[in-house]
A protein has these predicted regions:
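Glycine-rich phosphate/pyrophosphate-handling loop used in enzymes and phosphotransfer proteins
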Residues: 1-140
């Protein structure tokens, strides 16, 4: 099968799965509307965003540490579902928020990396959630 044929088959499978299991917002769990990509419009407006003036922190041996959202309420619940509930499909939504935060803060990262899970935790969870985020952001 050609590459284009593979893409068509994969696209068909994705659309079919979306019919059976519609994509949901990782924060409020509402079914996404056709025009919404990864995060619903309501959550995009109401997520507890860290103000730009507080996003970028510096430390003694670290050039910068940034965060797009406060870790509370729906954000906290969403991250816990991602980390412990096997909802690895949330990774692209989180990666998009992280990349936006990097760009907003003028950080030109050459590489995104992570500390891998131990073998024991990897077996328990079935996937390395931090590794997925790093993988989604490698195109930074």
């Amino acid at each position: 099968m050609t590459k284009e044929g593979e893409r068509n088959v994969n696209s068909f499978i994705e659309r079919f799965l979306d019919l059976l299991f519609p994509p949901r917002c990782p924060f409020c769990r509402a079914i996404l509307k056709e025009h919404e990509t990864r995060i619903c419009a309501g959550c995009l407006q109401t997520l507890p965003r860290v103000p730009l003036s507080l996003q970028r922190q510096t430390f003694r041996h670290i050039e910068a540490c940034v965060s797009p959202l406060y870790y509370k309420d729906d954000v906290r619940s969403s991250l816990l579902r991602y980390k412990f509930g096997g909802l690895y499909t949330y990774s692209q939504a989180y990666a998009d928020l992280m990349l936006d935060c990097l760009e907003t803060n003028g950080i030109d990262a050459d590489l995104i990396t992570w500390v891998p899970l131990s073998d024991k935790r990897l077996r328990k969870r079935g996937y390395d959630q931090a590794g997925l985020l790093a993988d989604k952001n490698l195109a930074c």
